[in-house]
């Protein structure tokens, strides 16, 4: 029983979300429309958006793979287009 409790506590910590991933999506105030990905904490998925090119925050990734790796998204979760 103690083993199971320890296992679930460790598993929960290992899938914790990076603090940057909890930041809201920020398009920025320029008009470049660069394809990027951000972690949507509501859907618990990385989603595509168009980044303006300036401003923004750390929840802004060049690739889906980078977003999933940094934010701990499991591969069974599919991306959602925005």
Swiss-Prot record:
Q: Which SMART domains is this protein grouped with?
A: KU (SM00131)
* UniProt entry tagged with the keyword Oxidoreductase: no
Provide the GO MF annotations for this entry. Answer: potassium channel regulator activity; serine-type endopeptidase inhibitor activity; toxin activity
Supply the alphabetized keyword list: Disulfide bond, Ion channel impairing toxin, Nematocyst, Potassium channel impairing toxin, Protease inhibitor, Secreted, Serine protease inhibitor, Signal, Toxin, Voltage-gated potassium channel impairing toxin
Please give the CDD domains that the UniProt record associates with this protein. Kunitz_actitoxin-like
Residues forming the BPTI/Kunitz inhibitor domain are: 21-71
Q: What's a GO cellular component annotated to this UniProt protein?
A: extracellular region
Please state where this protein is localized: Secreted; Nematocyst
Q: Which SUPFAM superfamilies match?
A: BPTI-like
Tell me where the signal peptide lies. Answer: 1-16
Q: Does the keyword Signal apply?
A: yes
What are the residue positions of the site described as Reactive bond? 31-32
A Pfam family it matches: Kunitz_BPTI
- Pro-peptide residues, renumbered to this chain, are 76-82
From what superkingdom does this record's organism come? Answer: Eukaryota
Which pairs are disulfide-linked? 21-71, 30-54, 46-67
Q: What does this protein do?
A: Serine protease inhibitor that inhibits both tissue and plasma kallikreins. Has hemolytic activity. Inhibits voltage-gated potassium channels (Kv).
Family label: Belongs to the venom Kunitz-type family. Sea anemone type 2 potassium channel toxin subfamily.
Question: What PANTHER family has UniProt attached to this entry?
Answer: BPTI_KUNITZ INHIBITOR DOMAIN-CONTAINING PROTEIN, KUNITZ-TYPE PROTEASE INHIBITOR-RELATED
Q: What is this protein called?
A: U-actitoxin-Avd3q
Q: Which organism is it from?
A: Anemonia viridis (Snakelocks anemone)
């Amino acid at each position: 029983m103690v083993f199971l409790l320890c296992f679930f506590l460790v598993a929960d910590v290992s899938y914790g979300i990076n603090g940057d991933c909890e930041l809201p999506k920020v398009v920025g105030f320029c008009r470049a429309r660069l394809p990027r990905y951000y972690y949507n904490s509501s859907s618990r998925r990385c989603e595509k958006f168009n980044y303006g090119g300036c401003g923004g925050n750390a929840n802004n990734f060049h690739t889906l793979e980078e977003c999933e790796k940094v934010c701990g998204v499991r591969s069974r979760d599919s991306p959602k287009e925005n």
